[in-house]
Amino acid sequence: MKNLVFLKPFSIKNPTLDEQNDFIMNEVFVEMECASLGEMYDNDKLYGKELETFIPKEVIDKHPDWVIAVGKCATVALGIRRQRKVLLNPKVSYEHLNNVTEFDRENTYGFFDDLHEQDYERFQSVFPHAMWFPQDDNLSLFTIKEVVEEIINGRTVA
């Protein structure tokens, strides 16, 4: 099984040393714990790239079974059609909700933390596989790793 995993890129303007260290440590932890999910695209691979063109090109070139994406990468991946996706905290615009195929409706899963409630509401209006975590304001791929494994391995997820 070939999957592509796009982690959250570093996007803090004028970060403090603590913010930089926190990001790096979290990314290393997620990479180590979630390596079995697929080929990882961490900040080193994403840095300086135009995500809006880079991510779709990687998907076209590599033909993955699943795309797993976090944050801004999830927002970009949401716009890719005819591709199985697991998305964590994408920013959902009304443009993303237009012309959605039945394949995309059935094969796109979205997970949202408390800070992305409005995105969750928009997403679940079109996509039936949506989950909101109201008690969590910093949902990570590691937090939902077991659920993601169930999805990409074809097991039923309630």
Predicted region positions:
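Catalytic active-site module of serine/aspartate enzymes centered on a nucleophile-bearing elbow/loop
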Residues: 139-158
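Catalytic phosphate/metal-binding cores of nucleic-acid and nucleotide-processing enzymes, i.e., regions
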Residues: 6, 37, 47, 56, ...
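The feature captures the conserved acid-bearing segment of alpha/beta-hydrolase catalytic domains
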Residues: 92-143
